[in-house]
Regions:
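Conserved beta-strand-loop-beta-strand hairpin that lines the nucleotide-binding pocket
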Residues: 1-13, 59-157
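Bergerat-fold GHKL ATPase/HATPase_c domain
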Residues: 1-49
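Short secondary-structure capping/turn micro-motifs that flank functional sites
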Residues: 50-51, 144
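Conserved polar catalytic motif of the HATPase_c/GHKL fold
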Residues: 53, 57
Length: 157
């Protein structure tokens, strides 16, 4: 018995200023790309939510300083967004240019027990792990920051 051929993976790749206006525009591009490739329902909603969380973190903590618009950046800072759909799963990765220690972020992704509800930070990344099958952090390809990669199997939830 042979299995049906798996569709080729489709990728959306964006390099944008690390500002909230870019993240807002990218959300629309990610949604359009995913819908054009047949993603819908809970899988689409989760992709948009996770992409938004990763981009927002890149803007706020990955070198963008929380800038709303590009004019507010003290220096040019970019984020790189990749969305891959392969017919069985999606993945989204966001790389920033804000330095950082992968071990510190990994601890936020995989805390011992629930995150402290009194802490002002750290819950978003943890909550993101509940919607994904895996979330990883590593040094970005340009070594200027971090790259977070989230994956979800389609229809698994």
């Amino acid at each position: 018995m042979t299995s049906a051929p798996r569709p080729e993976a489709e990728e959306l790749l964006l390099e944008l200023p690390a500002v909230h206006a870019s993240a807002r525009a990218a959300r629309g591009l990610v949604r359009h790309f995913a819908e054009q490739h047949g993603l819908e329902g809970a899988d689409l909603d989760a992709l948009i939510l996770i992409a938004d969380e990763l981009m927002t973190n890149a803007v706020d903590h990955g070198g963008g300083g929380g800038a709303l618009e590009e004019a507010q950046l003290e220096r040019p800072v970019a984020m790189r967004v990749s969305v891959v759909l392969d017919g069985a799963s999606w993945s989204v990765s966001v790389s920033d240019q804000g330095g950082g220690d992968p071990a510190v972020v990994d601890a936020l992704l995989h805390p011992e027990g629930l995150p402290d509800l009194e802490d002002e930070r750290g819950r978003g990344l943890y909550l993101m792990t509940l919607e994904c099958d895996s979330v990883e952090v590593r040094r970005s390809d340009d070594a200027l920051g971090l790259c977070l990669v989230a994956r979800r199997v389609l229809g698994a939830r």
